[in-house]
């Protein structure tokens, strides 16, 4: 059993290393394709994006994982279903609030050009919430390689979509070019589910 856990840990670590390397490659590519000014806009929106997804991605996977692991085999899907319900209910409130207050959030960042990025961030609340719940469930049923592979697939899609859009649409305005990384994250998460 210990050898199996060690092998699984090594596999997850290796996959995570590849995911991080792809992320570094993406950031280098973005800085070259977008330039400093647009990267600055993207970074401002990233801060708001991270804050927006925190309610559904911080503690929820751990809670679902623990509840799933402790549940009887016939009840193991109950935490998953409860988590999905919670994500839907929270997203029903948070997504409209994000869209409604995105102009004020953009002004708060000091650069209204983050607005398209914030619009793309709103659906991420629901999508990343689902992803968090499913990952927690998979950890709870001890299938931790699936979330790792899912993350790898997401990162590959994120890189391909981001690079593809920026190369295919070279004349995007600064606000919309800065929204491409957020859009690619949203799309890659859907594909990774």
Predicted features, each with a name:
Residues 3, 34, 38, 52-86, ...:
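Transmembrane-helix boundary and interhelical linker motifs in polytopic inner-membrane proteins
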Residues 100, 111-134:
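Alpha-helical transmembrane segments of multi-pass membrane proteins
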């Amino acid at each position: 059993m210990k050898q199996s856990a060690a092998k699984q840990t090594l596999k997850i670590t290796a996959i995570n290393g590849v995911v991080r390397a792809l992320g570094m490659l993406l950031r280098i590519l973005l800085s070259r394709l977008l330039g400093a000014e647009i990267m600055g806009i993207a970074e401002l929106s990233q801060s708001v994006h991270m804050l927006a997804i925190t309610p559904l991605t911080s503690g929820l996977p751990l809670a679902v994982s623990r509840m799933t692991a402790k549940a009887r085999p016939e009840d193991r899907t109950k935490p998953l279903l409860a988590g999905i319900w919670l994500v839907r209910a929270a997203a029903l409130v948070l997504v409209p609030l994000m869209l409604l207050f995105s102009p004020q959030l953009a002004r708060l960042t000091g650069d209204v050009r983050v607005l398209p990025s914030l619009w793309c961030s709103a659906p991420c609340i629901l999508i990343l919430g689902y992803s968090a719940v499913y990952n927690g469930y998979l950890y709870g049923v001890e299938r931790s390689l699936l979330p790792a592979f899912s993350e790898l697939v997401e990162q590959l899609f994120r890189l391909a979509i981001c690079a593809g859009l920026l190369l295919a649409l070279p004349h995007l305005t600064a606000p919309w070019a800065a929204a491409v990384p957020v859009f690619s994250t949203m799309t890659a998460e859907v594909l990774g589910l």
